[in-house]
Amino acid sequence: MKKILLIATGGTIASTTGKHGLSPTVSAGELLGFVPEINNFCTADYIQPYNIDSTNITPAHWLKLAAAIRENYDDYDGFVVCHGTDTMAYTAAVLSYLIQNSKKPIVLTGSQKPIDLEDTDARINLRDAFSYAASDKSAQTTIVFQGKAIAGTRAKKIRTKSFNAFESVDFPILGTVRDGRVVQYIEPPESVKKAVSPAFYERLDGRVGLCCLTPGFSGAVLDAYFENNDAVVLSGYGTGGIPGGEYYDLYDVIEKWRGKGKTLVVTTQVQSEGSDMGIYRVGRDFKERFSVLESYDMTWESIITKLMWILSETRDEKEIERLFYKPVNYDLIV
């Protein structure tokens, strides 16, 4: 029988209603009490490194969570992380980079309604997460939600209230869980199967900013982003179009920061199908003039957290580029 560790961090799944609205109050042990049926296929222990609304998550929380998994890694066959849905995709992505090539599954789940409500989605999500964590075919970091297993770098919350809150962006789901039965569609990659042990990382550079272009956007805003961040993710239009000309002044701002150790990544505001800056002149001219990284089919969550990991490891421009384009947990199709 598999031995699974529940790591409770708060979120809606652990919330109760007070005079100021929902807030996390339910303990890890109490969460397990709602799903006694998991004892039929695994044994479960629990820890609770923090109990927060996931809106308040910081890189320090992520490092604490990764450390909890690292410290318990040898003692368990898998891990289930209860988490708020609002930033779950960010946490799943960052764990993919902080704990690479894990043969043991690290499964995030949560709910759109608190676990103590009669019409909640929490109990089935939690049960499914344990089923997936106990499966012989699962590995790496995933989100299990509404019966779908989604790679940690491909998940995005696309609905604020519906139970079917998450989708896998530009990549198939890894598998499904129905009535405790796991159907695995995509096997773990060879890099995971061949790994003797996972690669654990213990640092993040939180100075990564996401800057979204809008018609009328001021170059002064981009300048402030460069001033206050080590990397800027510039979200352009369509396939990665970046406006030129004196009105926007973006070229002059980027020229100003050129050679000052800043990393610039261009992505798209469109959720599906990624960037392709070579199609239109507004993208091609920009990419040819400046040394920028292009995100292609990566999600915002993966771009940002991957940069946090990379910049904590190196500031060498060539090494940053190499690591950025190195696929991790299905984050990039090359």
Regions found by a protein language model. Give the residues of each.
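C-terminal non-catalytic interaction/assembly regions of soluble proteins
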Residues: 239-334
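Short, acidic/small-residue loops that bind anionic groups at enzyme active sites
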Residues: 92-123, 130-136, 257-268
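ATP/NTP phosphate-donor binding region
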Residues: 1-71, 272
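Short Gly/Thr/Asp-enriched flexible loops that form oxyanion-binding sites at enzyme active sites
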Residues: 82-104, 244-253
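Internal gly/pro-rich beta-alpha loop/helix module
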Residues: 108-179
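Short beta-strand segments
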Residues: 7-9, 81-83, 107-110, 142-146, ...
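Short acidic, glycine/serine/threonine-rich loops at helix termini
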Residues: 17-20, 92-93, 118-121, 151-157, ...
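Accessory alpha-helical/coil subdomains and C-terminal extensions
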Residues: 2, 7-11, 15, 27-38, ...
